[in-house]
Amino acid sequence: MTWPEKTLPTTDASEKRSLGAGVFRRCDGCSHTHDAAELARTFEVCSQCGHHHKLDADGWRRLLLDDGELAAWDEHLVPNDPLRFSDGKSYRDRVAALHKKGRAKEAIEIGRGRLGGRDIAYGAFVFAFMGGSMGSVVGEKITRLFERATREELPVVLLQASGGARMQEGILSLMQMAKSVSALERYRKARLPFLSVLLHPTTGGVAASFAFLGDANIAEPKALIGFAGPRVIENTIRQTLPAGFQRSEFLLDHGMVDAIVPRPEMKAYIGTLLQHLTAGRRARR
């Protein structure tokens, strides 16, 4: 018996192939496999179980703002490295790498848009940029958001998804809590409405400052909302926390948020609130 002279072509076993990468997505809630384009059409909400995956800033713009258009404010502001912080990689290099990848310039975008035909001052955290952490630039942009909204007599809609204060800026990041809340208090004296939208996750210094100070605090389903994470709390107090602790539903039951609104209903819900809260007022141009 002789071996055949022709052999089949071989492949390098070290080459890893990803079938359907970027084409199919598995739901984190029910493990159903989705066409990625289908999830994009539903703004990252699973059609089988209703699980809400993270939606980026561009997706939120398209979902909430008329025609998805935002006249951005203060885009020139970018983070500095005042402490020359390094944890194996310098803070400056981390920011530069994110900019090189085409990510946002910072962990928040602000500007003027229209929601349901009504002018609003709009802000949305960018979780993909260092976990939506709040440093000096984020605090400054939130402050400017409220200050400009006060001058132009605009309602503020602010979407929050953040891990808290940015450790690379130390005490400078913590000072943004007081600074932003001071601007918010001046805004409130003008008797203008602030709608706070709490996304997954909203934690740390953001949760401890302006996140719960809205005239209406609206949360997405099953969002993690709180100061420290559940594991940190359990390790500190050495007790087991109640089921669902720090989730939207738990907070609603205990009066910490005013409503839980599924993502597909968010624009209509906010539009109705604005209609009631801004009746008889017109924004300045």
Swiss-Prot record:
It is an enzyme of class 2 (transferase). Binds 1 zinc ion per subunit. One of its GO terms (molecular function) is ATP binding. Residues 23-285 form the CoA carboxyltransferase N-terminal domain. Its EC number is 2.1.3.15. InterPro entries: AcCoA_carboxyl_beta, Acetyl_CoA_COase_Trfase_b_su, ClpP/crotonase-like_dom_sf, COA_CT_N. Pathway: Lipid metabolism; malonyl-CoA biosynthesis; malonyl-CoA from acetyl-CoA: step 1/1. A zinc finger (C4-type) spans 27-49. One of its GO terms (biological process) is fatty acid biosynthetic process. Acetyl-CoA carboxylase is a heterohexamer composed of biotin carboxyl carrier protein (AccB), biotin carboxylase (AccC) and two subunits each of ACCase subunit alpha (AccA) and ACCase subunit beta (AccD). Component of the acetyl coenzyme A carboxylase (ACC) complex. Biotin carboxylase (BC) catalyzes the carboxylation of biotin on its carrier protein (BCCP) and then the CO(2) group is transferred by the transcarboxylase to acetyl-CoA to form malonyl-CoA. This is Acetyl-coenzyme A carboxylase carboxyl transferase subunit beta.
